[in-house]
């Protein structure tokens, strides 16, 4: 029987020689570094091909007169957030940049695909045959940390690419720009470590919101400067040093262990991304992704306040059915907030609402005299595009399923990342358990001799 703790038999790519059936995928290539490289490069090619093809699909179906979030788009909003093809208020001014991004991804996917095919079929089975620099052994702790170092440097460069785009190559879209958002060059990113790392020390609940509470582009770009430099510095550190004794003893050093570590990290990122896209309207502007749930609720309260005020209602003193303020009331800390069911979202901050605030919450004088037409239009739009799928009202938002066919990209992205994060967590636990069992020498493995498929006739 072949197990991960008994790999002396591993040599080919079939079940008898590796102990892994075809559906075990890359496990068959544990000791074939060249073939494993081919699998990884081809996988990257498939990912990039999807990105390019799906971008062109969205470009082909794009309707300029409708907001992106009403068209089920999940890729064009990311390109627009980077400042390509959009202008004031997030209006699409040119779809050619979207087309270019899609084509570039298709071209690069072809290069990656050819590289994957080459390494899978023609290249050296084991990279050590080609170069000692690219060769590795899963138990070679120093080489493993070298590979970590290369990855960290690439990740750091990726973070700095966003910085360069924001500061030197046309800027990025800032939903907080005056008048309803615009593309803006970030000239003064936040570098103060107390501010950047202060986000990590915030509570993850309520108005604190941990890193998800970031509400300005200066902090986002400054954070990427810090992350980029930290990743590059960490990469250089891991290349130049060898693992300390405690790390050698505490960690499991095998291919499956590295897989489990990676899945755990991706799971954490998935959960963070899920919450980020659900709550944050700075990194994920509502002009492209649609309003947050809290934003839609506050928009509805604002829309009806504007309507009834024009009809003569006294918004300051009108009472609702509970005896609380119908339009305005006090928060627990004394701020003036919207009344009604949306009171639970009194912590909400949005670029269309903030101009109407004063030193103590919403400013009554501004609500009576300074509401601008663009704020009313945007609130009405957001009110009818809540990222909700409920049969009843949520936060006071009417979610009648008979209205029109709409699913918010925010709901798609938040849900998909949460579900994927959960499955990656399960995968992390599964592979971590197997890796530790293999290292301890008591892994059972699966007795392939009694596997039913081995006794079935060929399909043809």
From Swiss-Prot:
Q: What happens when the gene is disrupted?
A: Unable to grow photoautotrophically or evolve O(2). About 10% mostly monomeric PSII accumulates, which corresponds to RC47, an intermediate in the normal path of PSII assembly. The intermediate is able to bind the primary and secondary electron donors and acceptors and can transfer electrons.
Q: Which residues lie on this side of the membrane: Lumenal, thylakoid?
A: 59-98, 166-220, 277-411
How is the protein disposed in the membrane? Multi-pass membrane protein
Q: Which residues lie on this side of the membrane: Cytoplasmic?
A: 1-35, 122-142, 241-255, 437-460
Binding-site residues, [CaMn4O5] cluster: 341, 344
Does the UniProt entry include the keyword Hydrolase?
no
Q: Where in the chain are disulfide-linked cysteines found?
A: none
GO terms (molecular function) for this protein are: chlorophyll binding; electron transporter, transferring electrons within the cyclic electron transport pathway of photosynthesis activity; metal ion binding
Q: Which UniProt keywords apply?
A: Chlorophyll, Chromophore, Manganese, Membrane, Metal-binding, Photosynthesis, Photosystem II, Thylakoid, Transmembrane, Transmembrane helix
Q: Where are the transmembrane segments?
A: 36-58, 99-121, 143-165, 221-240, 256-276, 412-436
Subunit text? PSII is composed of 1 copy each of membrane proteins PsbA, PsbB, PsbC, PsbD, PsbE, PsbF, PsbH, PsbI, PsbJ, PsbK, PsbL, PsbM, PsbT, PsbX, PsbY, PsbZ, Psb30/Ycf12, peripheral proteins PsbO, CyanoQ (PsbQ), PsbU, PsbV and a large number of cofactors. It forms dimeric complexes.
- Function in brief: One of the components of the core complex of photosystem II (PSII). PSII binds chlorophyll and helps catalyze the primary light-induced photochemical processes of PSII. PSII is a light-driven water:plastoquinone oxidoreductase, using light energy to abstract electrons from H(2)O, generating O(2) and a proton gradient subsequently used for ATP formation. Required for correct assembly of PSII.
What is the name of this protein?
Photosystem II CP43 reaction center protein
Native organism is Synechocystis sp. (strain ATCC 27184 / PCC 6803 / Kazusa)
């Amino acid at each position: 029987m072949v197990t991960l703790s008994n790999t002396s038999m591993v040599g080919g790519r079939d079940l008898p020689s590796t102990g892994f059936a075809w559906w075990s995928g890359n496990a068959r290539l544990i000791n074939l570094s060249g073939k494993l490289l081919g699998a990884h490069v081809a996988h990257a090619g498939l990912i990039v091909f999807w990105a390019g093809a799906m971008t062109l699909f969205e470009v082909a179906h794009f309707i300029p007169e409708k907001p992106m979030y009403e068209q089920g788009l999940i890729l064009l909003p990311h390109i627009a957030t980077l400042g390509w093809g959009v202008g004031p208020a997030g209006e699409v001014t040119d779809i050619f940049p979207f087309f270019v991004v899609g084509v570039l991804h298709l071209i690069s996917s072809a290069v990656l695909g050819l590289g994957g095919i080459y390494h899978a079929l023609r290249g050296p089975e084991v990279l050590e045959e080609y170069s000692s620099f690219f060769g590795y052994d899963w138990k070679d702790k120093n080489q493993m940390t070298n590979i970590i170092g290369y990855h960290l440097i690439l990740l750091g460069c990726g973070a700095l690419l966003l910085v360069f785009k924001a500061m030197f190559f046309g800027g990025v879209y800032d939903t907080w720009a005056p008048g309803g958002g615009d593309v803006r060059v970030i000239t003064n990113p936040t570098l103060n470590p107390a501010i950047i790392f202060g986000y990590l020390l915030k509570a993850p609940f309520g108005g604190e919101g941990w890193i998800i509470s970031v509400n300005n582009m200066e902090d986002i770009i400054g954070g990427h400067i810090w992350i980029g430099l930290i990743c590059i510095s960490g990469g250089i550190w891991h290349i130049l040093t060898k693992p300390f004794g405690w790390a050698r003893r505490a960690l499991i050093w095998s291919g499956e262990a590295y897989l489990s570590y990676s899945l755990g990290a991706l799971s954490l990122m998935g959960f963070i991304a899920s919450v980020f896209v659900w709550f944050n309207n700075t990194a994920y502007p509502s002009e492209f992704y649609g309003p947050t749930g809290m934003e839609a609720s506050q928009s509805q309260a604002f829309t009806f306040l504007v309507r009834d005020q024009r009809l003569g209602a006294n918004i300051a003193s009108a009472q609702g059915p509970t005896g609380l303020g119908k339009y305005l009331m006090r928060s627990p800390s004394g701020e003036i907030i919207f009344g009604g069911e949306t009171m639970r979202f009194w912590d909400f901050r949005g670029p269309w609402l903030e101009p109407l605030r004063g030193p103590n919450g919403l400013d009554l004088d501004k609500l009576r005299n300074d509401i601008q037409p663009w704020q009313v239009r945007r609130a009405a739009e957001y009110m009818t595009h809540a990222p909700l799928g409920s049969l009843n009202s949520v936060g006071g938002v009417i979610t009648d399923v008979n209205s029109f066919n709409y699913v918010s990209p925010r709901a798609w992205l938040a849900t998909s990342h949460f579900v994927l994060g959960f499955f990656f967590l399960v995968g992390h636990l599964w592979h971590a358990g197997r890796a530790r069992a293999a290292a301890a020498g008591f892994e059972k493995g699966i007795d392939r001799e009694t596997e039913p498929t081995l006794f079935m006739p060929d399909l043809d």
